[in-house]
Amino acid sequence: MKTMTSAEVRQMFLDFFKSKGHTVEPSQSLVPVNDPTLLWINSGVATLKKYFDGSVVPENPRLTNAQKAIRTNDIENVGKTARHHTMFEMLGNFSIGDYFRNEAIAFAWELLTSSEWFEFPAEKLYITYYPADKDTYNRWVEVGVDPTHLVPIEDNFWEIGAGPSGPDTEIFFDRGEIYDPEHVGLKLLAEDIENDRYIEIWNIVLSQFNANPAIPRSEYPELPQKNIDTGMGLERMVCIIQGGKTNFDTDLFLPIIREIEKLSGITYSPDSENMSFKVIADHIRSLSFAIGDGALPGNEGRGYVLRRLLRRAVMHGKKLGIQGKFLASLVPTVGKIMQSYYPEVLEKEDFIMQIIDREEETFNRTIDAGQKLIDELLVNLKAEGKDRIEGADIFRLYDTYGFPVELTEELAEDEGFKIDHEGFKVAMKAQQDRARAAVVKGGSMGAQNETLSSIEVDSKFLYEDKKSQAKLLVAIKDDELVDEVTGKAQLVFDVTPFYAEMGGQVADHGVIKNADGQEVATVLDVQHAPHGQNLHSVETTSPLKVGETYTLEIDEERRSAVVKNHTATHLLHAALHNIVGNHALQAGSLNEVEFLRFDFTHFAQVTKEELAEIERQVNEVIWQSLKVETIETDIATAKEMGAMALFGEKYGKNVRVVKIGDYSIELCGGTHTQTTSQIGLFKIIKEEGIGSGVRRIIAVTGQKAYEAFKDAENTLSEVAGLVKAPQASQIVAKVSNLQDELKAAQKENDALAGKLAASQSDEIFKNVQRAGSVSFIASQVTVPDANGLRNLADIWKQKELSDVLVLVATIGEKVSLLVASKSSDVKAGNLVKELAPFVDGRGGGKPDMAMAGGSNAAGIPELLTAVAEKLG
């Protein structure tokens, strides 16, 4: 077995399959593009689903990749086991209807055992297979595997409900009896017992059958197109080759661990039970790559995952004694380890470090807040005579504030409290079940559309044409090829001026005419067929025949509006880079007829001043009437020109570059104006957050922009009339004066409310009652608003009248309830929660003051009567 670095292992895998005629697919972003079923790219095949389901036909049916992936369902196991990671790399080879079982198995055996490649000892490799899959068993024997090293496993069948399915075969490496102290042997494999001896390194899935839950598996029909989907974990492979005890004892993690040693002053050992080194090393990799790919920490979705990873890493840093912020300092090390194949971490190093540093600083403040919550929780539990923190409370501290159970336990033990570990496990499992249920499982292929996949005719899109003569080559009706169509159908022509929806630009609409100039069909939509042809969805008014020539005419007014928005999107993107920063990467776009919508990565709201400058800059470029050039070239030349490749887009060898003067240059396959002046005008309508670390700008151009400005002008005129401002320029002064008058009136109102409260207080405070050792006042009062209740409570606080005050009032149709307490034995927040249901309300607050709102005034007498009972 050869000695290799992780970079060499990755490269050897790709080189091998390249030598077998595979195209190397570049690793895609961890943030899925146009796939709402995934939170993260979580496997090597996840970015290739479009090929397996037939929606797109690859230029080469043989593919290979090294794909970064994230899975966080079992985050708690990271650091505890030898091989759990949140971010990992999958090496894979894939066949889309090309080779199948025989070649896939032969390739795997050659790569692993040949002296030209990895040169694993054959006697160290064991194979599992599906018992009924005799073809796989026989093929392994044919390539040279000892039959005693072939282990049948009933679970070796890949299936998710109805649809593509098939057997899989897994390759394991035997690390020897040193990792099998009880000498269990092959039983570990046969009975699927968790162990460190037999390490799975490669799984080959044979997508062969069309599963149907209604019939036995043995009767599943075969798929018309059989596919191969394989996955090899790079971290496991490197661990075996480099002889590491765990995946962390390799060149993928050790440089990070060495930096953590310097920060903590503690020496790492593979035999040490201290998992903190491993947790930090794992999590900083995930954070660096995910943030580099445009995800940002937040409170939901993938942003929540990142925030949780960061907080977990910080807490483990504290366990190692690391003081202050430290995580960002590890990013350059991650970048250097991965730079040979993933240069983006070093390229975006400053931005990644800035985000991590800011988030860590925020969390350090959160820790202080969490400490206060724990203290408050313990005080309340003591008051209630309890000596145990319930699992639900532990989980809330863990889930919301990132407090590990160990830290909560340590703080609790200092105060003499026990921990409800079982309750915590129940809450944790419930969350994990919810997380797993939320994941829509997907496999290596979906339903295959044979009709669309069979269309291989040549068809060309004519960028410059608005109308063209075209021959009808293919007609599809109800998913079948036909020679003549009526009604709704899908058509492919030899050429077309109709743009197919792509890259955020909506499709062209228009009409189809016959040789006599009569309209015979309306084009409602245009999409790309699997082989790339423009597929026209139409509603016919007369029959259309394959082989005949028709005139295709786009709706020019619609196209004009769309291209204005598309070119303006390029200008907006450039302006964002100039004003907000280069980290403002496109995360989605839509160029419609009425508006443009642009999503971009940014960690804060764009300020009013920034929006004004963006709008000004875009309009300035529009009025300069810069030429919009389109250049067709190869991808390497385009990158040398400085063309920006957009987020999530995949480009072939030849690309179109859209260059707008010296202001903007991007790779783009869409249609555009000829000059910027044709856009006319640009107006931002809205800026908002749409998710963790993603902002959205909605804007309009041309006539729609003029209408937006006109609407604003009309609104301003109406406001001027309302505030009696002769000119629009005087509105601000008028409104400012009105605000001053309102403040003065409010001040006077507050003074009157205070006097009213004082006048009532003497009468209210006379009625002091007792419930056991607690004195209290409970009264219904008349106040103009909730502030009136607070005013009365303030007066009560200044006097030694009673331990507890309960005030209730009807304000409009609502009921307001206030509870105040000076007694350490009575928590206002708890009491208000007990009383609020009497008026169909709810509320809460602090131990000394709490409020609630309700809707049932009829319950007030019963509420007041219940006070004594609740305090007794």
UniProtKB/Swiss-Prot annotation:
Its EC number is 6.1.1.7. It holds the Pfam family tRNA_SAD. Binds 1 zinc ion per subunit. It is an enzyme of class 6 (ligase). PROSITE patterns: AA_TRNA_LIGASE_II_ALA. It is found in: Cytoplasm. GO terms for biological process: alanyl-tRNA aminoacylation. The keyword S-adenosyl-L-methionine does not apply. Keywords: Aminoacyl-tRNA synthetase, ATP-binding, Cytoplasm, Ligase, Metal-binding, Nucleotide-binding, Protein biosynthesis, RNA-binding, tRNA-binding, Zinc. Its cofactor is Zn(2+). GO terms for cellular component: cytosol. It comes from the Bacteria. One of its GO terms (molecular function) is zinc ion binding. It catalyses: tRNA(Ala) + L-alanine + ATP = L-alanyl-tRNA(Ala) + AMP + diphosphate. Zn(2+) binds at H566, H570, C668, H672. Consists of three domains; the N-terminal catalytic domain, the editing domain and the C-terminal C-Ala domain. The editing domain removes incorrectly charged amino acids, while the C-Ala domain, along with tRNA(Ala), serves as a bridge to cooperatively bring together the editing and aminoacylation centers thus stimulating deacylation of misacylated tRNAs. NCBIfam families: alaS. Belongs to the class-II aminoacyl-tRNA synthetase family. Catalyzes the attachment of alanine to tRNA(Ala) in a two-step reaction: alanine is first activated by ATP to form Ala-AMP and then transferred to the acceptor end of tRNA(Ala). Also edits incorrectly charged Ser-tRNA(Ala) and Gly-tRNA(Ala) via its editing domain. This is Alanine--tRNA ligase. It comes from Lactococcus lactis subsp. cremoris (strain SK11).
